[in-house]
Amino acid sequence: MMDINKIKEVLPHRYPFLLIDRIIDLEPDFSAHAIKCVTINEPFFEGHFPGRPLMPGVLVVEAIVQTACFAVGIKMKEEMKNPGVSFMTIDKCKFRKPVTPGDVLNLK
């Protein structure tokens, strides 16, 4: 298990755009399992939507991408290579249910 401090060593993102809280499983260069505890204090809930807060889908995708970039970036960092990893495109993305305050995202 890796906490937020380890995540910040690998990813360049910071509040409010660091969207993963913890890595709970990792196979470097292959996969990672992260979690994001979604709270009512997330800055995007103020405007999305008042009275019915929903996490924007693009931020759910961003959290998944950060998880994948961590899986690749940690090995690059350990090997002292440039840890910069970018995600360029996504096709056929579907959201099965809304993400609301109190939810825990399991990102794989």
Please give the residue ranges for each predicted region.
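Catalytic strand-loop segment that frames the active site of acyl-thioester-processing enzymes
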Residues: Y15-M55, V60
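Hydrophobic beta-strand-centered segment that forms part of the acyl-chain substrate-binding groove
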Residues: M1, A68-K108
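Beta-strand-rich interaction surfaces with strong enrichment in secreted/lumenal proteins
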Residues: K8, G51, F95-K97
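Active-site- and interface-proximal helix/loop "cap" or "latch" segments in soluble metabolic
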Residues: M55-P56, V60-I74
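Short Pro/Gly-enriched beta-strand edge/turn motifs at strand-loop
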Residues: M2-I7
